[in-house]
From Swiss-Prot:
One of its GO terms (cellular component) is plasma membrane. The chain crosses the membrane at residues 14-34, 37-57, 59-79, 80-100, 102-122, 126-146. This is Sensor histidine kinase YxjM. Gene3D superfamilies: 1.20.5.1930, Histidine kinase-like ATPase, C-terminal domain. Keywords: ATP-binding, Cell membrane, Kinase, Membrane, Nucleotide-binding, Phosphoprotein, Transferase, Transmembrane, Transmembrane helix, Two-component regulatory system. Probable member of the two-component regulatory system YxjM/YxjL. May activate YxjL by phosphorylation. InterPro entries: HATPase_C_sf, Sensor_HK_TwoCompSys, Sig_transdc_His_kin_sub3_dim/P. SUPFAM superfamilies: ATPase domain of HSP90 chaperone/DNA topoisomerase II/histidine kinase. Residues 209-396 form the Histidine kinase domain. GO terms for molecular function: ATP binding; phosphorelay sensor kinase activity; protein dimerization activity; protein kinase activity. Residues 1-13, 58, 101, 147-406 are cytoplasmic.
Amino acid sequence: MNGQTPARHYYKKLVPSLILILNCIQFLSHPTKADPILLAFVFAVYLAFIWIIPYVASTAVSLSIFIGLWLLTDFFWAVSGQEQGAAYFLIVFLMIYAAFRLPSRLSLIFTACLIGGNILLLSSQGGSLNTIISNISIMLGLYVLFSSMRFRREARREAERNHAELAKMHVQLEHAHKELQKAHAELQEASVLSLRYAVLEERTRIARDIHDSIGHELTSVIVQLQSLPYILKSSKEDSEKVIQNVLSVARECLQEVRSVVHQMGRSESMVGLTALRGLIHQVEERSGLHVSLDTAGLSEESWPPNVSETIYRILQEALTNIIRHADASHAAAVISNDKSHLYVTITDDGQFTGSLTYGFGLTGMKERAEKAGGSLTFSAVQPSGLKIELSLPLMTTNKEQKDEQR
């Protein structure tokens, strides 16, 4: 029932039924040439029509019912002679219902047929020109009035449907946006974990070096110190040699410890470049996109952890966008620096020609760069492709180097 409540649907049938019943009583109460039984029968058919037509889904069946009522009414008009009050009322009633129930074009054609039939009947029964014009004017006016009411009602319903669909789409978009944010957060967390794993791997390597080099040398020191009391009793010269050997090994251990500590202090920054190479290798294996990395202009390889993470995530998002949207076969990343800044340029040979839409990924890249105190720009590459230029400050690195020198 088009989403209507049962009470409203019942009301829409009850009102026209009462109109028919009241008019039928009025026409029967006045003496006319029309057969009362035939008049009551025609009104009863119309009454049944009101309660049946809402359940007819087929347009063809509905049109057939309307045509049948029209022919029945014209027959009633013809056999009633000059008495055409009840018949004319029923014709107008049928026209109004057609304006509401039939499709717009069919209702217009059906109304034209009704008007044409009225003209023929009035002419055949000697109706005057003024009567014909008056009847046609009334019918046209009523048709325009009720058709406009129908159009407004349909427009309102369409607007309500569109509003409901937009609200539903808005909810779906909000859900999708939350899912994207969740996925993006998980991706960020995975990026951080990959960097941490790289740091742990580097520290494991350093621990292994300590065990293999310093551990061996300290074992040698312990053995020589354990034998020293016996050597002192036997030969003074041999004992001096042992002491010199122990001192030499101890100095080497100290130098090795300093070297390891220095490497551990730099491991979190040096891991940035290692992580980038690992990311590029992973992308090439999984997507088939060829990615080159140029570090010829890189003289400063000691990056702060926040710089390493920012570069890693921006390169990761850039390569993801290239794979998804650019239809590129090659991408290139160039990393360089000067005294105060680190520069990363990412280019591809994809389909981009100059019209850029800032989506979730590009906006996130730009915000990430700005959060790190840097900047990110996008520009077109001739003949096609996209260039991403990232600039990040290295002040934190310079400060760390000064602390190390102290």
